[in-house]
Structures are given as C-alpha cells and as structure tokens.
Amino acid sequence: MSPAESVAHLSPERWAEANRLLLRKALAEFAHERLIAPRSLPDGRYEVRGDDGLTSYRFTATRWSLDHWQVAAESITRHRDGGELPLSAIDFFVELRKSLGLSDEILPVYLEEISSTLAGTCYKLTKPRIPVRELAGSGFQAIETGMTEGHPCFVANNGRLGFGVHDYLAYAPETANPVRLVWLAAHRSRAAFTAGVGIAYESFVQGELGAETVERFDGILRERGLDPEDYLLIPVHPWQWWNKLSVTFAAEVAQRRLVCLGEGDDEYLAQQSIRTFFNTTSPEKHYVKTALSVLNMGFMRGLSAAYMEATPAINDWLAQLVENDPVLKSTGLSIIRERAAVGYRHLEYEAATDRYSPYRKMLAALWRESPVPSLREGESLATMASLVHVDHEGASFAAALIERSGLTPVEWLRGYLRAYLTPLLHSFYAYDLVYMPHGENVILVLEDGAVRRAVYKDIAEEIAVMDPQAVLPPAVERIRVEVPEDTKLLSIFTDVFDCFFRFLAAQLADEGVLGEEDFWRTVAESVRAYQEATPELEDKFRQYDLFTPEFALSCLNRLQLRDNRQMVDLTDPSGALQLIGTLKNPIAGF
C-alpha cells in the first residue's frame, strides 16, 4: 500500500460527515455532564455559544430521562457574525476550551485524540452498510468488528495515540484484519508464569501453540546456544514489538534475556478493547490479552507484570463464588476466566519508577477462556455493546433482536435484565462485589434473538470488593478497595443506569419499540423481583436504596478533559470521581 492509498478513506465528504457525527455526540454528552448549558430558542432549537460569545452552535434535540440529550445530527449548524460556518470538531473544542476546562497542556493531546477518532469514523464510513436485521443473524466476530461507536459516553473514544495509519489499518478492530502475534522467549530470571488450579505451563503452551510450533521455537533457542528450559514464551502485540520492545527493551534483547522467535501460526482478530485478540483459527482456544503502550481513553493500555501474578487466583476465586451461589447460578451467569498469565520484569525500569508507571506495563500477557465451547445448540454470542449499536437507517441492534425473538419488547427486556442486571445486584448486595459492566465487558448468549444468559469478562483488572471486613485469600487481597459509603451505589447508578441503560432506553423509545416509562418500569420490576426473592438481604436493600429519588452525576468526559493521559489516580480511584450535581432516579417512582 502506498502512502497515498493509506489515507484513501480521508475524503472531504466523509470528513464532513464524521465531524457532524462527533459534534452530535459532544453536544449531547457535554450537556449531560453540564459542561455546557444549551439554551432554548424561540424556534424550538437549542443554542450553545463559544467562550467568546461570538460563535454559536444550534441544533434540535429530544430530552429523555437521566438528562439524556438525543441531538439530531443533521440539525447542527455553526454561526458567527450573522453567517453560517462549516462544522469542525477541532474548532469546536478550541472555541469552547474554557467551558470544557481544557488546559494548555491537555488541549493539543485531546485534539490529537479527536483527530484520530474522526479518522477512524471516516474509515468506518467506507465499510459496507450492514442493516441491523442482517447483523443480528451474523456470527460473534462479525458483530464484534461491526461496532462503529465505541464507548457511548466518551467523545474522544478512539484516540489510540501511538498508532500510525498503517498500524490502524493493520490492528484496529473495525478493520477486521487478521493478526499473527509475535512470540518472545523470556528468561525465567525475570519472567514469571502463573496459572489457575490444575494448569501446567508446558501442557498449556502446547495446547495454545501446538507441538510443532513449540518445537520450532525451541529450535531457534538451541541454534543460539540457549536452553529452552531457561525461558518462558510470551505472546506480544506486533505493534509493541516493533515500536517499544525492540527499542525500549534493547538491552534485554542484546543480552538474550529476551529472544524474538517470530510469529505464531494462528490468526487472531483484535477486539473492541484493541489489545485483546480472539483466535479465529481455533475459536475454542483462549483469547490473548497483550500489553500495548498506546494511549486510549485516558490510559496507556499496558499490562502490569506484577499484577499478572495474582490474575489466575482472582479469577478462580470469583468462578468458585459464582458456582457456589444459587442466585447467581440461577441467572445463568458465567465468567470467562483469565486462566494463565505471564509477565516480564525489567529490573532497571522498576528501580527508576513507581508501581503505576507505564514502563512497568510493557511486557505481559494473559490468556482468557473463550466462550465458544460453552455454547449449547441454537445459541450464539454478541458483545453487549451491540445493543446500542445503530445502523445507517437509525435502527438499533437491540430492536432487531427483539423482532427476531418474537417476544414483546417488555418480555425481551425482562430476560435481558435477569441475565445481566440481577447478577450485578446480587454481587453488590450479597458480597459488596462490583464489576466494570460496560458493554464491551459483557458477552450475551442469545437464542433466536432472546438473551439467555450473560458472560462477564475482564475480571482481575476490573472487579473490586468494597467490604473492609470481607475475608479474602491472600492472593486475592488486591481487589479490596476503600470506597466512601455514599458512592458505593454508583457502581449500579453510574455504570449501569447512566452509562448503558440511558442510551438503550432512549434509542428504543425513539424507534417506537418500547416507551421510556415502560423501559424503566420493567427495570424497577426486575429490581423488586430480585429483592423479593432474597429477603435475607433486606437490611442491605434499605442501606443502599436503589429507589432513592436521585443520585450523583458522575462524569466520565470531565475525567478525560482534566487529564487524558492518566484519567484516574490508580492509588485512589474513587477519589478521582467528578461528581456534578444529581440526576433523578428513573426507577424511583415505581
């Protein structure tokens, strides 16, 4: 591919459409987070003015529960000095930099993230437009790579700073290009492999790579006069090898503490999280999650070698908890465990940095179970993020599933809530256990469009126990966190209601599939049904009241706008929350 061909997706027409789509989201989410305060105009439109008061943006919007703004993209216009100007997302952020709290230091990096997000949208606009009715009948990975929006709340949600255009085309999930991972041999003096109960290193690696590939890799080491027994194998994102390890870890390579063995044989597809790969050659094999020193949505996407040591133990602990709890088991909940992990510790960088430094997160990997072997006849898989996916005609994937199922919208929603929400509620009330249950972290098991059960993933890095008195095994202790009492329920109110149900409810209502009041009534009924089935937790239900009239508005974009390179202080995650006023609880009246 020539340099010119690599940017063929960047045309004036697609750039204009991408800018309009991004401004629609920016106006909606910044109004939701009260960064901007659109004022009503006599003609029924809304207006937002730039910091200088001279530039204005006008648009129409529908307002839903949870102060959700659904902005009509085609209605947005930009005005200055009595004339209309072309839409430009970059100009928008410069014109409202003070309103958005963008510092001189953060602004250019944020603009780079916005530019990257726009470029990604341009590429997506070149892809064949697949109606959601067709997508609803597609396979697991066709749905995964068919997602177009990314995180529904974050405006700059496809920054991926560090990727050049050739990297984007090779590794972005939406390009759906097959990837072969690079494998390194890492000397055991600095590397460690940990695994769940009953897993041995040799048999596990043989199962993932195959005997022939392992023998080939061992042969490369022997040719260099090295003993394969002294090394552990680590899968590496190709970008990480070419751009980081081959340079930043040059001393390790030169001294044969790291040996590049080349690519493996299996082909993988990048998932929405960009650093996790699904094995398309053998779908029953494990996902591989790799370290990737790329800045995306407020964090460098590395993997801590130190954290990898406890990862399998945390997963085994949670899997046992789910297996032994009759309520969780009755919902069909399962987790796909991170069964094994490997990490490499660069001792010199460790001596020079604190434990949260990106330099300690450059070389590690984990293997996560595939959900494919657990499928029963007639079942299929879809990322939960797909529910809020909307096609070019404005139709949602959720609506397509409802139609496909033959159920009424309320019946379909009840099944989904039992599979997804009930386990979250029970984990919270029975164990003070919380997840990061956004759309990309949950896989839905479907049968003829109906949700049968949910699969939670990304366990070790995302779950937390908020009970200071909980008895945890020593290896699991790191998931205990201190959270102020008055913010504990935000794990449901923010992560579930505001960051996912808000979008799903508004979209289904906008399509005329299910009225907003009916949506939230069904959620309330689902909560009541769970509470009535677990009367032994009545005191906890009173202590943490899901039917409280209002709850704090926790703002995600404000975190990124404040510091887009380290969005949350990892030493005090709850202390980083940006709480701005309150939202009316949509289930309080039921």
Where are these regions (language model features)?
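Short C-lobe core helix of eukaryotic-like protein kinase catalytic domains
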Residues: 421-425
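Protein kinase catalytic-loop region centered on the HRD/HxD motif
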Residues: 426-431
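Nucleotide/phosphate-binding site architecture used for ATP/NTP-dependent chemistry
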Residues: 1-419, 446-590
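A short glycine-rich, hydrophobically flanked beta-strand micro-motif that places a catalytic Asp/Glu
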Residues: 432-445
